[in-house]
């Protein structure tokens, strides 16, 4: 069974995330998330359609998102493995992930190791 970076075999079972934007609350399905990026005391949740900002920690998402689908590939990024198009060598100790929407994310050596485990590489 794949291990996430946090050591939990299955990770969490979070299915949706509520984000308040002004007077509205948007409900995001985790399957729609491309990646999550840390931004100080907040995180940016990137989907195909929109980018959302939420006051939450990366550790919270790392623990609560499904570990077979989401991997922390860098201290600043958690990626949905189903949204990865390509993985390429970037520098000696890192890889560059190209997502289906064209965004590029650098994976650290430990993040790439965790990604390889989830992808069975």
Could you say what each language-model-derived stretch is?
Residues 110-121:
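Short, basic/aromatic-enriched C-terminal tail that caps enzymatic domains
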